[in-house]
Structures are given as C-alpha cells and as structure tokens.
Amino acid sequence: MNPERFTEASAVAINAAQQLAQENHNQNLTHFHVLRTLLDNDTASRALTLAGGDLNTARAALDAEIAKLPKVQGSDGQLYLDPALNRAFQKADTLAAQLGDSFVAADTLLLALRGEYRGRGLPDEVSLNRAVTEQRKGKTVTNKTSEQQFDALNKYGTDLTQRARDGKFDPVIGRDEEIRRVMQILLRRSKNNPVLIGEPGVGKTAIAEGLAMRIVKGDVPEGLRDKKIVSLEMGSLLAGAKFRGEFEERLKGVIDEVVKSAGEIILFVDEIHTIVGAGKTEGSPDAGNMLKPALARGELHLIGATTLDEYREIEKDAALERRFQPVFVDEPSVEDTISILRGIKERYQVHHNVEITDPALVAAATLSNRYITDRQLPDKAIDLIDESAARLRMALESSPERIDQLSRRKLQLEIEREALKREKDVDSQNRLLDIENQLKTLTDELNEVRSRWEAERGEVAALREKREKLDAVRTQIEKARRDYDLEEAARLEYGELPALEKDVQDLEKKLKSAEFAHMEVTEEDIAAVVSRWTGIPVSKLMEGEREKLLHLEEQLHGRVIGQDRAIVSVSDAIRRARAGLNDPNRPLGSFMFLGPSGVGKTELAKALAEFLFDSSDAMVRIDMSEYMEKHTVARLIGAPPGYVGFEEGGQLTEAVRRRPYAVILFDEIEKAHPDVFNVLLQVLDDGRLTDGQGRTVDFRNTLIIMTSNIGSPLILEMQQRGEDAETIKSAVMDELRGEFRPEFLNRVDDIIVFDALTAKDLQSIVDIQLGGLRRRLAERRITLHLTEDAKDKLAELGYDPAYGARPLRRTISQYIETPLAREILGGQIQDGSVLNVDYGDGGFTFNSGSLN
C-alpha cells in the first residue's frame, strides 16, 4: 500500500509500531504492533472509549500478545509485513474510499485492524463504526491533517454543563443580575456575544459556571433550555500546531461544529483577549479575524471573560469589539463576600475535613478587604479560608507536639543507656538502672498517647469518609430531581441523607472534645495567615505583647534620652493601631520631628522600627537631600510610561508594596523640592499613592516620620533663655509655616519639637554610646568598666548644645577607642581581661587585670 495514502496521525502510529517491533526484537511487523501504538492516538482512543471499549485492558492484552511473538537476536533490523496487517491495510484503503476520504485516517485504520483482532478491551465492530460516525459529524478526510477537525470541541474544550451535572462546581452566590444580563444578550438575534469584564478575582469565570448550573437545573428562559456551554482552551488549540495552517484548521473545526449545532452550543473563552493575534503568522489570519464572520451573523454564540486592562487588546480591533456586548463585573462588597463564603464553606469542609466557623468567614472577608489591598474580593477571602483550612489539615495529619517531645526524650535516654552499658563503675550502673526505669515509664506513656492519637485519627478519617458520602448523596439527589426520578430522590433524601447527617454530627461532636484533633478553623487562624502574607500583626494580642505595648515608653527611653513628649506621642499612635482604634483610611500615624541636629530624631525612628520588627534596619529610609530637583519626584513613585526605568517602579512605592507594614522615615525633609510634598499629600490624608504604572499602593499600615532641622537655632536660643516648651513650639511653627504649605502641615498628625540636650542628658547617653564598644570588646572576652569621673569627663568633652550627641561619638573614639586599640595591638591588654578606665591628673588611665 502507498505510504502517501496515510494521514499524519496514521503515519506516526505506523512508525511507532516499527520502533516497537525493533525494541521487542520481532522480525515481523504485525497488526498487534500497529493497534498498540494506535491506542495512543487521540482520535482512535477517543473513538474506542466512545464505543464502550476499555483502553487500559486493550493495551494490557496487546502487550501480552506482543510478548508472545517470536524474537530474533542479532538480525539486521529488517522488518517484514505480516499477512494479517497487509489485509488490514487493504481493508482500510477500501473503507476510506467508502467514507469519501482522500487519505486513510487513524479511526479508519482502527476499524480495519478491529476486523483482524478480537481481543479483550475492544468494542464490537458495530459500536466502533457508530462511534467513528458520531465523532466525525459528517466530515471527510481531504488532507493529511484533517483529523484535527474531528470532534474538535471535545479535543480542545471542556463541557461546563456536564461538569455542572457531575456537581464539580462550587455554588455561585449572588451575581444574579450579571447572569440575567448574560442570558439577555445570548437571546439577541445578532451580536449575541457577552464579554465579562472585571478585575482579576471578582468571579467572572464563576458567572459562566453559574449559567451552566442554571441550564442544568432548567432555571433559564426557553431559548437557552438544554443548551451546552463548552469552555474553549486556547492553549490546547495552539499546542503542537507545528505547520502553517494547522492552528487555523483546528479552530475552523471548532467554529464549524458550533455553527452546525444551530445555537445548541455556547462557547466560553476565558482570557478572550488571547484570540487577538493568536496563531497569526505572515499572511495568515489570527483567531479573532476567523471568528468575526460567525460572530456578526449570530451563528456563533460566545461568552468571553477578560480583565479591564486586557480588554484594551480587543478594543484595538474595532470590528471585533463591536461584535461583543460588555458586561461589567464589579467587586462584591464585604457583606456579599460573607454570603459567598457561607455558600461554598461546605465544599472546603469536605475537601480539608475540618470545620470552618462562621466568625472565621467574617474575619476572612473583613481582614482581606482591609489588609490585602492589591487583590480583589471574593478571591482573596476564599484563598484565606483555603490556606487556613490547609494549615489546620496539615497539623491534623502530622504527629502532635506531645508525641514529638516524648519520642525525642526517649531517643536521648536510649543513647545515654547505650553509652552507660560500657561503664563498669557503681555510679554508672545506678544511673543505668535509673534510665531503664525512666525508659519504661516513658515508653508506656508514649504508647498510651500514641494509641489515643491513632484513635482520634481514625475518627477524623471516618468523618472525612462520611462527609464525602454526604456530598455525593446531595449531588445524586440533585440529579434524581432533574431527571424526575422522584422515587430515587425520595429514597436518598429521606433514607440515606438523614442517617449520614446524623453520623457526621455525632463524629463532629465527639471530635470537639478531642485532645489532639483540633478541627475548627477560627478567626485566629485567619488572622495568622493574614499576618504571614502581609507581615501586618492582625492576630489577637498576646498577654506578653500587651505588657510590651503598655510599657513602650520605658523601652524607647532606653534608646532615646531627654525627649519625653516625642516618645509619649509616638507610643500612643502605636497603641491605637494595635488596639484597632486608628482611622482605617489613614496611615497608623504621621509625625514631623523638629529640633537641632543630633538630639535623637532619627534614633527614635530606628528604635520604633526595632520595637515593631525586632530590627532597627526594618524601616524604609528616604534621604530627602537626594530629592532636591523637580525631576527626582519620579524616583519616589516610579518613572512614567516612555521614560527610562518605567519597569523598575519607585523607591518609595516598591518598598511599601513589598513591606506594607513599615516605619517610613523621610530624613531632612526641608531639603526636598516642594513638588515632593504634593506627592505626600495623598499618602498623609488617604493612606494611598498611585505609582508610575498606575497601581495603587497602600500606606494605611505604615508609620510616617519626617525629620527636619528647621528652627534649630531658634530652639537653642530660646532654651538658653529658659522659655517654656509651648512658647518654643509656637515660634518654631511660625518658621515652619514659612517653609511648608498649610495643606501639607494640616495633614500631619503631630508636629513634635525635640529639646536641645542638656549636660545631664549627655551623661545618660555616654552609657548608650559605650554599649556598642562593650559589645565589640565582649567578642574578645574583654570587660570594660568606666568610673563616674571618666563618664562625667567624656560627657563634658562631648557636650556641644549646637551639635547634640554626635560630638560625643567622636570624643569616645578619640579618648577611649584609639588608646585602647594601641594597647591591644601592643599586647598590654590580653583577651579575657577586665579593663578599668578612670580619669585623673588631666587624662584617662587604663588598668587591665585578669578576668579570673
């Protein structure tokens, strides 16, 4: 037979059969080899399944037949055609002519081979013939790739109505208005193609699934009754289309099948913007252009879904856009989201085998709405429920902490016992006896705890099984009602269902008092997941954290000396935020710190970051002296489109997007260009900022601190004159109004004037500054002690009211660190010694002694 008579799919199967024969050392190419490789072909395997055959059984039977064939070792690899296969090829040629085919397709070859082999797993010839006819839907093979068009919808699509019948979808709650609008558009005479447009995660695909469920239930107008919704997979259409025209052929097959159904099939294309440009090569049309004629005539019913941004791809092609009717899908409110979560809760309970409490659903909707701002409801709330349930399920299926502790203790004692067995002295033997007794007690306790845990695990497994049965019975009841099988529906509803519900309730009640199996997802679990996602502490305050917050001032006083008013004001803002009383639409707090250089403005910001995040580096620090020119505003929020660096994002916006809970320090704000303050107005008032790429960045969980040296000479002068704090603040505010616009100052929560440091303050700062040196010396096991005289002298030498505490650092470096370095290098001070520093006779003296 002429090899050119075979389609590509048939030729691939025959080549694979030759390879299979050579691998098995068979000299004859038989019908078993070809039939075995043909079962891996899409068209042939689908026809076989459709006819009632069993693919796995057929493959196993053919493998057994091939194993029985004679093997020839060391031959030249020459293959001979088996007479039975030759007959099958002749028959296939005849069948192709009868069907009006120009080439022998894979399904024709399967029919011919079925006549030669009647093994297990294969259907009878009549059923197979019927299946091939049904699959072809009247199409003939006119070229080598024509099979791409056979049963195109089943190959490249998913039947949503069938999935709805099988109970695969979660219930669609709400969205009645959008589903009604989609049905209204589908019933139009022409341009009956709705496209669902909305942000990612608002439930566009769910609307198509909801419509499929309504069609299955019969809850649709007469014009849509018994219609079929098929979801088209653009990826499957494109995958493997190697040659020009192959993609178009597949798509043409889909379009023809939908058009031929005369409105009975509705196509659903998720991410519909992908049809613009899909499959386009030089000189060939894209998918969008191929769909246009059928869409315009109303022959092709199509539902699309895409996001607002990606719909622009379709808007570029006005001729395609006019064929669609947009249906805008808005994000549901928090209340609607809670209703949606209540509707789908059952499915997640069955999947994870846990109980999801109602407060957890409310927490998922409210917390995701407040803290996860870059995604949409209900998607982000569903994700929270899913992850919290998965976390609890993982804990349920892992070994409990109590068993872990006992197992580790047992292992430790066993190692100790083995070591003591080698010792012969009396003490070791007594200790060995003691360990043996401990091990016996521990093993008994471990076995008892383990048996209790195993019993609870058994109950958890039983509950999962019952829940799955309950879910299956509910699906069967729905099906029986749809089919008007009222007897079956009554048997299930009044026979099996109540018994299963009672079993589930009994097991749930029993597991509520379980020692290890904690089955409930609570609002604390949801809060813990939100904290892990965003880094924002939203979980309930622990006792230790309450104490820490109430004594926040004392902690900050340990780092920042002499600034009581500033510390109290900032501490109150943090307490309000953690108690949940701050305005949810503004940052946690915004402060402007004014005062002379070196009095602790930046240090207080670092101390706050350390308190909140356990690291003084965990803050976003923006040095405003870098933003003195007008064009540098773009560096904060990101360059606009068309400029270099557009993709990179802004220094401020990107930092906050990655870490939404942060202390943001704008250092030396008076040095920035006035336009920078216009950017900050939105942040201070609404807690939001739009970056260069149009994304909204959420600042509602940030603490904003701005530092400035404005009025520093005035503060020093007035403090030396002995003026009170209010008079000083009033004078500084007058100077501040000359520098900043009222709308900017008005948005700041509190403007705090830092006091100039006194000589007494500096004595306290000496200890803080020496702390770093002590830590560095501790690495060499050197202990440093300073007498009060030495500290007083350092404070005196380092005191300069105009420069604050910064000269003190230089003083310590000059009078303590430099001489110390010389003595360490000279060998006078050894590692592990105690160093006493004193002041007398006009200089500092260093005496070292052994640590012992």
UniProtKB/Swiss-Prot annotation:
Chief site of localization: cytoplasm
Region of interest called C-terminal, as start-end residue ranges on this chain: 757-852
Protein family: Belongs to the ClpA/ClpB family.
Annotated gene: clpB
Protein residues bound to ATP 2: G595, P596, S597, G598, V599, G600, K601, T602
PROSITE patterns: CLP_R (PS51903), CLPAB_1 (PS00870), CLPAB_2 (PS00871)
UniProt cross-references to Pfam families, sorted A to Z: AAA, AAA_2, AAA_lid_9, Clp_N, ClpB_D2-small
Segments of this protein annotated with the region Linker: 332-535
Coiled coil: 382-513
Recorded superkingdom: Bacteria
UniProt domain comment: The Clp repeat (R) domain probably functions as a substrate-discriminating domain, recruiting aggregated proteins to the ClpB hexamer and/or stabilizing bound proteins. The NBD2 domain is responsible for oligomerization, whereas the NBD1 domain stabilizes the hexamer probably in an ATP-dependent manner. The movement of the coiled-coil domain is essential for ClpB ability to rescue proteins from an aggregated state, probably by pulling apart large aggregated proteins, which are bound between the coiled-coils motifs of adjacent ClpB subunits in the functional hexamer.
Region (NBD2): 545-756
Listed name of the protein: Chaperone protein ClpB
